[in-house]
Regions:
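A short, compositionally biased domain-edge/stem linker segment
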Residues: 41-47
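Secondary-structure junction/capping motif
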Residues: 29, 65-66, 151, 155
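Hydrophobic alpha-helical context, especially transmembrane and signal-peptide helices
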Residues: 26, 30, 75-76, 156, ...
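Bacterial N-terminal signal peptides
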Residues: 29-41
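N-terminal secretory/targeting leader peptides
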Residues: 47-143, 162-163, 167-375
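N-terminal secretory signal peptides that target proteins for export/translocation
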Residues: 1-27
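A gly/proline- and charged-residue-enriched helix-loop-helix capping module
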Residues: 140-157
Length: 375
């Protein structure tokens, strides 16, 4: 198993700002660590072809299309094919492998999980700077998300390499998370006074900034919470909400994306460098294609989720509802821009540190036109 020494003390990224060291990793059961480690093939006998290299990969969330349609076939079918059988891979979703998403990056850093999908919103609970790409209402549509991702990627690549010893190999996104409500609403301002299901610190801060009442509820309980009136609105993905019956529990949903769910596929640097050069090249090329497919899927699934909840003829694979779709308008866009500048970004900078405002203004502000204020 590849071993990577834990970082000692603070590290300094390429741009010169001192940053916090990676947070300590909690103790993990020995059996789990061994099961997730890189499987190294035994050396072949003289004259025999080399034994295949066997990789163990921690993928994204189970049961979602990103994993079932894209990640699993890529690693189990395409990787052996594009490497001529030189590399074989096993993959399992992290949430079915006894791994907390909050610890995935640390496990990759230590080499316990050599290759894994890191959901940035979860990793940000230890290091808020990681999720500067997917703050609430930062990316109201996929075109904006693409610009933000392209702007933030060079910094995120350097951060992961220098702070964690991890290589960013691909960047993925889940479909947009939108707002479902039991009663009519015409925009963000109408959420004042309403109890809203949220799933992250950033979403809760946004709802508080709108004078709403954030309520953190597990996704599986969201439909019942809406039906029973525990909450009046919920933030979740349009198609996922449709799958659990939110089109029957709510009457209106927004087209405006609140969050997305950006993740990175990352490798322990030592484990990545240990692969033969030609295998690395072919896998990297394959991951670039996979990234493009996943982004395309996220865009299509976002639109399809809205179509199904609204009962449109274009609905595919979902249950048709009769929901009203709340379109964005000029007043709502102005409110979104103010909230981003006055609530969302300041809240993130408070958690992240004043240096994060400087980083944001260097990388992201030129792409979207919104600057972060330093504390």
């Amino acid at each position: 198993m590849t071993k990577v020494a834990a970082h000692r003390g603070a590290t300094r990224p390429a741009h010169g700002r001192r940053t916090r060291p990676p947070p300590p990793l909690v103790a993990w059961p020995r059996r789990l660590l061994l099961a997730l480690a890189l499987a190294v093939a035994a050396p072949a006998a003289a004259g025999e072809p080399p034994a295949p290299i066997r990789l163990r990969v921690a993928g994204g969330l189970a049961d979602l299309g990103q994993y079932t349609r894209r990640e699993h076939p890529f690693w189990t079918q395409q990787v052996p094919e594009i490497t001529g059988g030189r590399v074989q891979a096993e993959i399992a979703p992290f949430d079915r492998s006894g791994i907390r998403g909050q610890e995935m990056l640390q496990l990759i850093r230590l080499g316990v999980v050599p290759f894994g999908n890191v959901l940035l919103s979860l990793a940000a609970s230890n290091d808020p700077e990681l999720n500067g790409i997917d703050l609430p209402i930062l990316n109201p549509d996929v075109a904006t998300l693409r610009r933000t991702a392209a702007a933030w990627r060079p910094h995120l690549t350097a951060l992961l390499r220098e702070r964690y010893g991890v290589e960013l190999l691909a960047m993925y996104t889940y479909p947009a998370q939108v707002i479902f409500c039991r009663q009519p609403f015409s925009g963000l301002s109408d959420l004042a006074g309403r109890r809203v299901r949220t799933s992250s610190i950033g979403q809760s801060e946004l709802i508080t900034g709108l004078d709403g009442i954030p309520v953190v509820i597990p996704f599986a309980d969201t439909a019942n919470a809406l039906r029973s009136g525990v909450v009046e609105c919920a933030i979740t993905a349009a198609m996922s909400g449709n799958a659990v019956g939110l089109h029957e529990a709510a009457s209106h949903l927004s087209r405006l994306a609140i969050s997305w769910g950006v993740s990175v596929f990352a490798a322990n640097r030592a484990a990545w460098k240990a692969l033969p050069d030609d295998a690395r090249t072919r896998i990297a090329e394959g991951l670039r294609r996979l990234e493009g497919e996943i982004w395309w899927d996220a865009e299509l699934e976002t639109e399809n989720g809205i179509a199904c909840n609204a009962g449109l003829d274009t609905c595919a694979g979902g249950r048709r509802g009769r929901m009203a779709v709340v379109e964005s308008h000029a007043g709502d866009e102005a409110r979104r821009a103010r909230l981003l500048e006055e609530v969302v970004l300041p809240s993130w900078v408070r958690r992240c540190g004043s240096g994060c405002a400087e980083t944001w203004n260097r990388y992201v502000a030129p792409a979207i036109g919104v600057r972060a204020r330093e504390r």
